[in-house]
Amino acid sequence: MGKENCTTVAEFILLGLSDVPELRVCLFLLFLLIYGVTLLANLGMTALIQVSSRLHTPVYFFLSHLSFVDFCYSSIIVPKMLANIFNKDKAISFLGCMVQFYLFCTCGVTEVFLLAVMAYDRFVAICNPLLYMVTMSQKLRVELTSCCYFCGTVCSLIHSSLALRILFYRSNVINHFFCDLPPLLSLACSDVTVNETLLFLVATLNESVTIMIILTSYLLILTTILKIHSAESRHKAFSTCASHLTAITVSHGTILYIYCRPSSGNSGDVDKVATVFYTVVIPMLNPLIYSLRNKDVNKALRKVMGSKIHS
């Protein structure tokens, strides 16, 4: 690419999901509804866990952090996406774009590791119930959660610092609904081989480590479940694990598709639709999947609602 076609940029233009005028209202209402449910479910779950002593256990400690990350995850992307649906000026400043990517990457990597930690927590709870509270001590819970946030922050700093070194772009139009790294790299004039290689390697390493932890945990859980004599208890355990694995599969599957392909620079329409699942849909589904059929959560919610009504 000739230097005459390259320039520094003060802002980027986000094309969004679709430029079809007839779809604007439908898309706006759909994503507004999803965002509303996401806020209500995740903030509600976090608040319920804090106020209910019944839920002061390791599994809900991790779930409260997952809900917090999902709330942040969604809030980083969806409000700007909703505003751009009707805005003629779909601009975002260069700094705003970099900040959005940094926060998005931090939350994304943190969530991936949190899901692995939660799978390990389920393994300890089901396979070693008598030692569960001793094994998953307050100290270990804090250390594991801190490690998740640390990994997210480090990965984000690596990618963001390298992205900030790109000075010239051949265009400022991003074919996406938020500032993600692959479409940004596709616009760069300079050599971004290091960026693309690191993105591929870091994403692949994170996915490999966390998927290995998750699969190992659930295989051991499955082995334990098969030894349960009660058909009802076995069915309950299977259904719970199946719902958890569904959420994990969708989340990890889309991440593998988007980021674990060498030189996946151009963000086409298929990539954007795939990205919607783990940036918009999964943050809404996670609190529902992890608590919908949970008796402890339902009892705690009824108790809190009952006390509010009678107060």
Swiss-Prot record:
Highest taxon of source: Eukaryota
Membrane-topology descriptor: Multi-pass membrane protein
Sites where a glycan is attached: 5, 195
Keyword Disulfide bond in record: yes
InterPro entries: GPCR_Rhodpsn, GPCR_Rhodpsn_7TM, Olfact_rcpt
Purpose of the protein: Odorant receptor.
Keyword terms, alphabetized: Cell membrane, Disulfide bond, G-protein coupled receptor, Glycoprotein, Membrane, Olfaction, Receptor, Sensory transduction, Transducer, Transmembrane, Transmembrane helix
Main location: membrane
Any one Gene Ontology molecular-function term assigned to this protein's record: odorant binding
Family named by the database record: Belongs to the G-protein coupled receptor 1 family.
Membrane-traversing stretches: 26-46, 55-75, 100-120, 140-160, 197-217, 238-258, 272-292
Cysteines engaged in disulfide bonds, as pairs: 97-189
Spans within the Extracellular topological domain: 1-25, 76-99, 161-196, 259-271
Protein name: Olfactory receptor 5L2
Gene encoding the protein: OR5L2
